[in-house]
A protein has these predicted regions:
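Short hydrophobic, aromatic-rich alpha-helical segments embedded in or entering the lipid bilayer
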Residues: 28-62, 262-274
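An internal, D/E-rich "acidic patch" concept
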Residues: 43-108
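A short secondary-structure junction motif
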Residues: 13, 58-62, 66, 251, ...
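Hydrophobic alpha-helical transmembrane segments
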Residues: 31-45, 76, 127-136, 184-190, ...
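Generic alpha-helical secondary structure signal
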Residues: 32, 46, 50-54, 80, ...
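Membrane-water interface segments at the C-terminal ends of transmembrane alpha-helices
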Residues: 2-9, 128-160, 188-194
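Alpha-helical transmembrane segments of integral membrane proteins
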Residues: 89-94, 98-122, 138, 154, ...
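Hydrophobic alpha-helical transmembrane segments of membrane transport/permease proteins
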Residues: 1-49, 153-174
Length: 317
């Protein structure tokens, strides 16, 4: 219900947006045509009726008709929500999933190293890079990398495919082309997240390394690597596991600004256009999906915390 209400808050509706767009093109829409469009799309009904129909249709697998008019479509209302999402969902999950894997694979070892080698040259270097990654805006980093890739590596920038493979069916060559374009958005999307996770891991591990049980184990001659990995890391990683709650929705939404700057065919620009054009069915379903994934992600993070840290138990009295 909250997702549906949020989409209904702006003044006007998708037909009004369509009328404004056609007026700018010099092709005004008559009042009769606008009324027929509203009746066809069900926008002339009361809000509670539209909500009940929306829920009922979704339960039957009908997500509705998209109102968007992007990228050369001749007329609006010509694609269903399923068709719009099918074009973007797979690429969004692939890009964000790849970014998350790279981020965690790099951030956790670096955070452990920085804590174990506190005040070393490597610690200072990674600390500087971490703060720089948090300070530089994603869209600015994207623009810089696009220039570097085009000027020094002679690589086409913008999007995830070259022009020859954009509309081509999937093949090994298309996958190679995707991988060659994937590094720029992966670096841009992963920089701030990697820097943040490095700082969290380092600070948490430093807190654990100063506790009495670690000092006692070190005094008894425990091996340094075993001493760090066996207990302090398992405790210090708990806050990182808690971030799984927002990792799942990020697989769908991605970064809207970065996707627009890099012209990525992901869900971010679709969600932005849907909100701007008041595409109630498309935007409402995406927001609903993000909310459901947030709840599922939070549940998964709680379960993982209970498995990783034996001190956490969910019991009833």
């Amino acid at each position: 219900m909250l997702a549906f209400v949020i989409i209904q808050l702006p003044e006007g509706d998708a037909v009004d947006k369509h009328i404004d767009r056609m007026l700018q093109l010099g092709d005004p829409v008559s009042v009769g045509t606008a009324d027929r469009l509203r009746k066809h799309l069900g926008l002339d009904r009361p809000m509670h009726t539209r909500y009940l129909l929306w829920i009922w249709n979704m339960a039957q697998g009908d997500l509705g008709t998209s109102f968007l008019l992007p990228f050369g479509w001749s007329t609006p209302f010509e694609q269903t929500v399923k068709e719009v999402l099918a074009d973007r969902l797979l690429l969004t999950v692939a890009l964000t999933g790849f970014t998350v894997v790279v981020t965690w694979t790099f951030a956790i070892p670096v955070g452990i190293y920085s804590a174990a080698r506190q005040h070393s040259v490597g610690d200072y270097v990674f600390t500087f890079l971490g703060f720089s990654g948090l300070a530089v805006p994603d869209f600015l980093l994207g623009l810089v990398l696009m220039y570097v890739a085009f000027a020094y590596f002679d690589q086409s920038v913008g999007g995830l495919f070259s022009a020859d493979y954009t509309a081509a069916p999937w093949s090994i060559a298309k996958v190679r082309d995707l991988l060659s374009h994937l590094w720029i958005p992966a670096v841009v999307l992963g920089t701030s997240g990697t820097a943040s996770l490095i700082r969290i891991m380092r600070n948490n591990l430093l807190d654990e390394l100063g506790k009495p049980y670690v000092v006692t184990a070190r005094a008894k001659g425990a091996h340094p690597i075993r001493l760090i990995i066996k207990y302090p890391v398992r405790v210090a990683i708990n806050p990182l596991i808690s971030t799984v709650g927002y990792l799942l929705p990020s697989l769908i939404s991605g970064s809207v600004i970065v996707s627009v700057v890099l012209s990525l065919p992901t869900m971010g620009p679709i969600l932005l256009n849907a909100v701007i054009q008041q595409d109630v069915f498309l935007a409402g379903f995406i927001i609903l999906m993000l909310g459901v994934l947030t709840i599922i992600g939070t549940l998964i993070s709680d379960i993982l915390l209970a498995l990783v840290d034996p001190r956490i138990k969910y019991t009833t009295n």
